[in-house]
Amino acid sequence: MLIFGFHSVTSRLRQAAGSVRELYVDAKRDDGRARDLLALAAKFGIDARRVEVSRLDRMCPSRRHQGVVAIVESRPPVMGLEDLLDSIEGPAFLLVLDGVTDPRNLGACLRVADGAGVHAVIAPKDHACPLNETAIQTASGAADSVPYIMVTNLARSIDQLEDRSITVIGTADGADQSLYEAAIPAAVAWALGAEGVGLRRLTRERCDRLVSIPMAGQVESLNVSVAAGIVLYETVRRNRSADRA
C-alpha cells in the first residue's frame, strides 16, 4: 500500500515504523519538514531514497504527495470490538458510521474523531469503505491514531455497546428532538449515515434514540464528516462544562 504526504507518512513512522518498507523523498526538498521527516526515519533505521519528483508523480498519479511517498504494509486490525471496549478506561466515546462508502468522507471522519478524542470508529464490513490509500491520506495521520473497526453485523454490534451501558444516539432528519435539546450521557456512541441516505432502517431501530441537527438554510443535509464534527464536539463541550460545574 502507498501512503503519501507529510502528515500521513510522519504519523505512520511514529505509530508503526516497522510497517514502512520503502520511503521516497523528493531530492530537491531540503526544507525543515523534509529534514525532520528524514531524521525521524533515520531514528527508526529507515533509509530514505532521494529521487526525482517525476518518479514520485508516477508512483502517486494524483501528484498530491508533497514530495514524500512511502510503501507500507497494510496494518491488520489492532483488536476486535470486544477487546477495544475492554481496553477503554472511563466512559466510552465512539463513532459509528453506517453506509459511508466514500474514502474521503471516511478519512475526514477519522480526522474529526481524532481531534475530539473518540476511542474508535466502527463500521460494517459489507456497507462501508475500507481503510484505503485515499482515506489514509485524507485522515492526515488520524488513521494511525484512531482504531477503525469493521464489524460483521452492525446491528448486533450496537447491541453489544448497549449491553455495556453505552448509549447509542443516531442522527436523522426529522427526528423529534434536536441535538441541542437532547441529553448526552457520558458513555455515548454516535451513529451517522451517509449524506442524503442516512442510517439504514435496522440501524435506526437499534439506536436508543434519534436526534436531528437543526438546519436554518435551504440545504436538506450535511456532509457526514461535517455532521460528525458537530455532534462530537457538542459532546466534548458538554463534558467540559460538566467537569467545570
Each language-model region and where it sits:
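N-terminal positively charged helical leader segments and presequences
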Residues: 1-84
